[in-house]
């Protein structure tokens, strides 16, 4: 019977299922976009693989995972409808990753590890620059994950190398310069 279909009685997932189907339909264009970005930023896929061991961490309710590659980042951005999946504005994140100024990670609910929840932009020492969910927003639900993110930062702090700390110091300076420029340009953050 059609009323027995999961999609009918699991309305909470309706939007997500729709987005997954759209992603499947767009897969070819996403792959082309990923190939284009990988050509332009040839180190990002390798950096993504390096991030796996250092930044991945899970607890009972939440987990932080590193993307496998540029395609995974683009897919995440498209599913959450935010700038990381965008051709134009998303490029700044690949530029930052290429320079090791900041990295993209995914915050997930542990019981739904494949479902996008929040996309994080972090500095090499684990400082969280941005937390974004659907439509480039941050909702009150992120407060529930704040304690987890603090514990995650403590765990990864023990995994960091001197090089990571040096990159983090440089990243902080670049972020401060960017804020000064945004203020000069009267951009509201």
For each feature predicted by the language model, list its residue ranges:
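Catalytic-core elements of nucleic-acid end-processing and repair enzymes
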Residues: 1-189
């Amino acid at each position: 019977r059609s009323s027995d279909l999961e999609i009918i009685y699991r309305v909470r997932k309706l939007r997500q299922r729709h987005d997954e189907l759209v992603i499947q339909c767009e897969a070819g264009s996403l792959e082309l976009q990923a190939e284009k970005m990988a050509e332009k930023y040839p180190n990002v896929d390798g950096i993504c693989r390096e991030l796996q061991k250092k930044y991945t961490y899970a607890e009972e309710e939440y987990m932080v995972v590193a993307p496998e590659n540029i395609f995974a980042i683009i897919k995440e951005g498209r599913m959450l409808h935010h700038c990381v999946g965008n051709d134009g504005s998303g490029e700044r994140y690949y530029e930052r990753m290429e320079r090791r100024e900041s990295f993209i990670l995914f915050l997930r609910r542990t019981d739904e590890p494949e479902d996008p929840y929040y996309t994080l932009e972090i500095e090499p020492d684990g400082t969280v620059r941005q937390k974004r969910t659907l439509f480039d927003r941050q909702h009150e639900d992120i407060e529930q994950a704040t304690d987890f993110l603090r514990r995650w930062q403590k765990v990864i702090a023990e995994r960091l190398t001197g090089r990571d700390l040096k990159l983090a110091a440089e990243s902080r300076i670049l972020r401060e310069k960017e804020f000064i420029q945004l203020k000069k340009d009267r951009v509201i953050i």
